[in-house]
C-alpha cells in the first residue's frame, strides 16, 4: 500500500505512546552504634527536608529498627541523595550509611 505523502494524516499513525513511570527507589539510613542521634536528625532535615518532628520520628525508627526509609525517589535523585548523605557523614567523621533499594 502506497502512502499519500500529500496527506500527512495518511502516514501518521494515530495513537498515544504509552510511557511507563520510572522505577522508584527507597533511600534508607542504616543505624550504627557511633553516629549521634542529633546528627541523624540534622541529615534528615537537611537532605530530606523533614521538619524537626518528622526527622525525630524517623531517627527513632532507624535507632530502634536498625534502618529507616527517608524517602522514595526516581533513580537519579536517589543516587544523588545517597552520595550526598554518605559524603556529608564522612566529612563529619561519622559512620552513618545511606543506601538505596528498588521499591
Swiss-Prot record:
Domain of life the protein comes from: Bacteria
Q: Which InterPro entries match?
A: ClpS, ClpS_core, Ribosomal_bL12_C/ClpS-like
SUPFAM superfamilies named in the record: ClpS-like
GO BP: protein catabolic process; proteolysis
**Similarity remark:** Belongs to the ClpS family.
What this chain does, per the record?
Involved in the modulation of the specificity of the ClpAP-mediated ATP-dependent protein degradation.
Give the quaternary structure. Answer: Binds to the N-terminal domain of the chaperone ClpA.
Name under which the protein is recorded: ATP-dependent Clp protease adapter protein ClpS
Gene from which the chain derives: clpS
